[in-house]
Amino acid sequence: MDRFLLSERSNYLGNTGAERIDKLLKLLPIVTLVVTLVTFVAFVVAYKNRQERPAYVVETHESQVEGRLVMVEGVQVVEFLGIPFAESTAGPNRFRRPVARSLPRKLSARRLGPPCFQKRDGVNATNASSPVETSEEMTTSADDGTLPASNDTRQPLSSVAAVVSETSVGDLRSTSRISSPAPWEDREQSSEDCLHLNIWVPHMESGNASTSSDSGEAKDHGPKRPVIVFFHGGGFQTGSNSDPRYDGRYLSALGGVVVVVPNYRIGSLAFISSSSDVDEDEPGNLALLDQWMALEWVRSYIGDFDGDPGCIVVAGAGSGASSLALHLLSPEAQGTVMGLRRFVLHSSSAFGPFADQSVPRQSQQILIPLARSVGCTGSGAPELLRCLRTVSADTLASLELGPGRSFEPTFESQYLPDTPSGLLLKIPPFRKQARGASVFASKHGHASFERLYVVPVVLVEVLMGNVANEGFQAFSSFNETVPSEISVDAVLHEFLPEELAKYGVRDAKALLRVYLNDTTGLSWDGMQSAVSHLLGDLLYVCPTRLLARYLSWGTDSQVHTFRMSQRMSYSDTETMTRYEDVDLVFGRPLRQPGSTEAEKILSREVIRAWSNFAKFGSLPAVNDSSSGSTIEWPSYTDNEEATVDISAVGFNLVPDEHRHHCFQLQALAAADIV
């Protein structure tokens, strides 16, 4: 009996074990899938953690600022994004001077801040032939709320596909239309709390900063680094430091410099004002005052970011370059900007369409109609401005001044009390001296100069220049106003004179003869080339040359000029157009797929040259074909006007092909334009 029970028990256990094994075998695929999924998730998490950039904290006298590490060709760069340098310009601060802002005790600077409100009508101020790649690194989404923003739903730039391009001085007219806005034109991303800056620091290891993995020991790598502060362009109408074009990591890493790119107010929110000669509270020209405050912030704080406050180079493109030239001339900025020694100006200067005071003054002529257009009533400027402070920023950013007009600097404020020519006469080296000589032989000083033996006050080193095809966008914009199926002759003699009149040209026919000796049988391509050349000279090249002459002959400043002519592979034009020179400075060919090896080499050479100018004030030697030798980059003088052409074939000394045209333009255009 016992034996039988034992046998039965064995059979029972055997049957049960077999069933269990069978069940386990059936569950095996599910178990395998679960294990695989868990392993995959663990791998992804581990990979993400490995890729996650460590936080990098800088301690200032009032704050701990957290940035992040990025790698650029094996070089560590610390990136600080969206650091506020002024209070929000909303509410009572609208139309007023920027107010200094203290940093919070802890600040996360790992995400871009919002762009300033700006005009958005499908017009974007860049070169449509030169699309800018979006950056997966530079994103605008808010990061833990430490940087106040008007909207927490902003999308990263990488989520917005847009072909963008930029113009410069006075040029909502010189724009190309696109189907979608640039990310910084998106009203949902914009804010009046937009006065912030981005900083890139190469291989930062000084004692006031540490990574999250540090042992806590202070490290010091020696002297502070030179600083390049770069102001973006956009014709004073568009643009932002969130444009990937101004991503400073490559310039910082390869140049060994600290790079700072600030925001500033633009459009109506920057240039609507009261009669500012009696009311300092709403002074106008707020874009310039924002830039001034950004420079003050840099001088105060940049030492904490390994930057040398005694070696700051200020650079700009387009309206950013125009701003720098105006700062140089402003009597109010002398204490701040004149303390800086080196400047780099791309494609613009203080002279240009906006410098002509023949247009009505904003504060006296346009404040009332603008206010009426948005429902504000009242007779006095203070009352109208109080009302305008209650209007949405979106509405104000959309305001129009009329055909051929845009919001831009005016010359009636405490900061800019006179035209550029008038301001030059107020700078000591340009005043009449004991000998009775004047640096200007004519009313505006455009015709000739006398060398003065004076003790110079303005002692700066300036690198300034243009691209080979400055007028491409201006012609493209003009071409959009011309009806199709129209003859070349009609364009030249009916439509173009009206366009030139917007820029102060008094004798369009005479000016056309300078660029077109014979229009008989002229092809459309021939006309486009000539008119593009004309507009480029009028708006950009000649104003830049004029400032170079003023600075080099009116002071003992060292001025060097350049022309960049390399055709970029991503461009539809035959030679370099506006802002493609900025691409070389910021290393775009090094990060954009499809760039040619020649473009990459050229970008490295430009970064090296610009960085050495920032560090030492020195420039590379150039090739002189006339002597067959290499010589020092010559300074710019009125009798020599040497220009260095920069392209893939090197840095070459070339004759200034614009000189003759610029002198003729002086006689045919409004006095303060060229």
Residues covered by each model-derived region:
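Substrate-gating cap/lid region and adjacent catalytic-acid/histidine neighborhood
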Residues: T32, D144, D281, A350-A355, ...
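Accessory cap/linker subdomain of secreted extracellular hydrolases
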Residues: I368-G402
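Catalytic active-site module of serine/aspartate enzymes centered on a nucleophile-bearing elbow/loop
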Residues: A614
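Bulky hydrophobic/aromatic "packing anchor" residues in well-ordered structure
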Residues: F85, L388, V582-L584, V644
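Non-catalytic accessory segments of hydrolases
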Residues: D2-E8, Y12-L288, P309, P593-V606, ...
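Serine-hydrolase-like catalytic core of hydrolytic proteins
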Residues: K26-F43, A142, A182-A381, L416-D418, ...
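Active-site-proximal substrate-binding core of FAD-dependent oxidoreductases
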Residues: S626-V644
